[in-house]
């Protein structure tokens, strides 16, 4: 690839990322649903849960509206009961958790995160789909992935464990992004 093609390609990637971010912000601001306002659990799976608060706001306040952080010298004045499940509060905002708990406030119990006999963070085939046990819930893909399955998954027993369907606006955004990617790919 010569320099011009490489430059066009990098501009295209930046353009796609900018468009997808605009659509993502539009979805978050327009839907008003908590599950779309926060990052998905799959996104959090690659990050430490102690970094992200459990109720992250969709739109962050301006820096002028934030409360200034307290210094370490004021830590004796902070609330010492910030941790759950017997965790020890450190500097008013961090927790040292007992062995079977984790999270910013020791709110996650490893012992309760299994899905019956299926351990947490384990993939398993279920009918014609793939499912994953995540924080005590079995989440299944609605598409057929396994060999020998021709159509959509017939999962009358898994309705409660499926992830929610995307609203029409999110589906439109997805198809629009795919179209943009395909048109850029055909350009090269």
Swiss-Prot record:
Gene3D superfamilies associated with the record: Laminin
GO molecular function, one term: activin receptor binding
Keyword Secreted included in the entry's annotation: yes
PTM info: The GPI-anchor is attached to the protein in the endoplasmic reticulum and serves to target the protein to the cell surface. There, it is processed by GPI processing phospholipase A2 (TMEM8A), removing an acyl-chain at the sn-2 position of GPI and releasing CRIPTO as a lysophosphatidylinositol-bearing form, which is further cleaved by phospholipase D (GPLD1) into a soluble form.
Keywords: Cell membrane, Disulfide bond, EGF-like domain, Glycoprotein, GPI-anchor, Growth factor, Lipoprotein, Membrane, Secreted, Signal
Glycosylation (residues): 79
Main location: membrane
Xref: PROSITE patterns: EGF_1, EGF_3
Residue numbers with lipid attached (GPI-anchor amidated aspartate): 150
Topology of the protein relative to the lipid bilayer: Lipid-anchor; GPI-anchor
Subcellular location: Cell membrane; Secreted
Domain EGF-like: 78-107
Signal peptide: 1-30
Tissue: Preferentially expressed in gastric and colorectal carcinomas than in their normal counterparts. Expressed in breast and lung.
CDD domains membership: EGF_CA
Protein role: GPI-anchored cell membrane protein involved in Nodal signaling. Cell-associated CRIPTO acts as a Nodal coreceptor in cis. Shedding of CRIPTO by TMEM8A modulates Nodal signaling by allowing soluble CRIPTO to act as a Nodal coreceptor on other cells. Could play a role in the determination of the epiblastic cells that subsequently give rise to the mesoderm.
Self-association and partners: Interacts with the activin type-1 receptor ACVR1B.
Protein name: Protein Cripto
Organism from which the protein derives: Homo sapiens (Human)
Gene that encodes the chain: CRIPTO
